Amino acid sequence: MNDEQRYKQGLEVRTEVLGEKHVNRSLENLNDFNQDFQNFISRFAWGEVWSRPGLPRHTRSLVTIAVLLALGREDELRMHLRACFNNGVTKDELKELILHCSLYAGLPASNAAMHMAEEVFKDLGIAPEKVNKD
């Protein structure tokens, strides 16, 4: 596969995972400073790594969220918390992932991710139900 084919495949995968709105916004904001970087992201991250057959996208989403949570990369984490539903991740899986990460990435990072996930859920209209504290 040549670079142009990999770029096209990357755009397709990137759109399937992150959504058309996000990818279109990135493409509309291309300029002479960021174009090479955006092309690299589409070609390498999405056309090469996310396109590999070894892990299903569902698993890739969970791994990505865990790594971003551990590294404290909040902008990317928010984006992938939003996008993971396109890959079949459930709210319960996210809850367990964040809880599990608290053991290895620390409580502050997981606490921030938990709040961020709740904000994303609210934005998507899937806010968790209130529970009775009794």
UniProtKB/Swiss-Prot annotation:
Keywords of this entry: Aromatic hydrocarbons catabolism, Decarboxylase, Lyase
Catalytic activity entry: (R)-2-(carboxymethyl)-5-oxo-2,5-dihydro-2-furoate + H(+) = (4,5-dihydro-5-oxofuran-2-yl)-acetate + CO2
InterPro entries, A to Z: 4CMD/NDH-1_regulator, AhpD-like, CMD-like, Decarb_PcaC
Gene3D superfamilies: AhpD-like (1.20.1290.10)
Listed GO biological process terms: beta-ketoadipate pathway
Pfam families from the UniProt entry: CMD
Class of this enzyme: lyase
Matching NCBIfam families: decarb_PcaC
Name of protein: 4-carboxymuconolactone decarboxylase
